[in-house]
A protein has these predicted regions:
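C-terminal accessory subdomain/extension
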Residues: 130-286
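Active-site loop/helix belt of alpha/beta enzymes
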Residues: 1-130
Length: 286
């Protein structure tokens, strides 16, 4: 990227063009690499160095008579933790989804953020199976006892990470690991389950760890993969929880969701202009 070693050469080209009127300097920007680790001293020092380098180039541009009109440097992490570098604009990315830049910084509520996206589906087939029943491809999950299973009609073709599969097979070559968390809205109240076996192209399966009839779980019940909850410990899974289950980050959980999943927009009429509303399917506006 652009480093201090290139400042003089860049200004030597920019200044004549600006004086000729063929170049108008509107903005100056850079991107912080490790602003999402405010508790790691070496990363804080690295961010401080980036900030000072940015300010140094601003001073050089001003001295050359071509000051930038708009400066923007702060990503979500810096927007939340470094108000002194907000300058004229900030660039919250994951913050627009209502999430902190990294779980190490806290939770959305730490910064008065509210997660803006909820991913829901309805249960497909619910059926009873015996103990030792293999679930999904590869039999990487065996039911430990007589139980019921339920299909969730979302898969990796929809952007559900295959790496969020759940393995539980004694003696298998696969390491036992929990799958992605799912909140099932039962007639007896919400319950938390996990992906059992491999995520398939169009679906994944839940082991309900009991009789569906006794648990009050039926085909068509609503399920929530993530939403504005407090986390899987409260049976309210978040995108951060799915990021951990899939060995990735919430950014990827959000941006991998495919267009096969219908979008519904809450409060759209309150926040969007008539021009933007016209771009949406009326049936998607709640």
């Amino acid at each position: 990227g652009f480093t201090p070693a290139g400042f003089d050469a860049a200004l030597a080209k920019l200044v004549p063009l600006a004086k000729e009127g063929v170049l108008h300097i509107v903005g100056q920007w850079s991107h912080l690499a490790v602003a999402d680790a405010p508790d790691v001293p070496e990363f804080v020092a690295s961010t401080d160095m980036q900030v000072e380098t940015f300010k140094d180039f601003t001073r050089r541009m001003e001295a050359a008579g071509i000051p930038p009109e708009i400066r923007h440097l702060a990503n979500t992490a810096a927007t939340l933790s470094r108000p002194e570098i907000h300058f004229e604009l900030t660039r919250p990315g994951i913050g627009l989804y209502g999430y902190e830049a990294d779980p190490a910084m806290g939770t959305p509520s730490t910064y008065s953020l509210k997660p803006a996206m909820t991913l829901q589906a309805q249960l497909g087939t619910v059926k009873d199976v015996e103990a030792g029943h293999g679930i999904s491809y590869g039999r990487t999950y065996l039911t430990p006892s007589d139980t019921s299973t339920a299909i969730v009609p979302l898969g990796y073709a929809d952007g559900i990470h295959r790496s969020a599969s759940g393995f539980d097979m004694e003696g298998a070559k696969h390491v036992t690991k929990p799958g992605g968390p799912v909140r099932v809205m039962t007639s007896e109240g919400p319950r938390l389950y996990r992906v059992s076996g491999r995520v398939c192209m169009d679906q994944f399966i839940l082991d309900l760890h009991g009789s569906a009839a006794e648990l009050g779980i039926h085909e068509g019940d609503n399920v929530e993969l993530f939403g504005p909850g407090r986390g899987e410990d409260y049976a309210e899974p978040t995108a951060d929880d799915w990021g951990r289950a899939a060995d990735t980050i919430s950014y990827e959980i959000f941006t991998c969701l495919r267009n096969r999943i219908p979008r519904l927009y809450e409060h759209a009429t309150d926040v969007l202009s008539a021009e933007d509303l016209a771009k949406l399917d009326p049936a998607s506006i709640l």
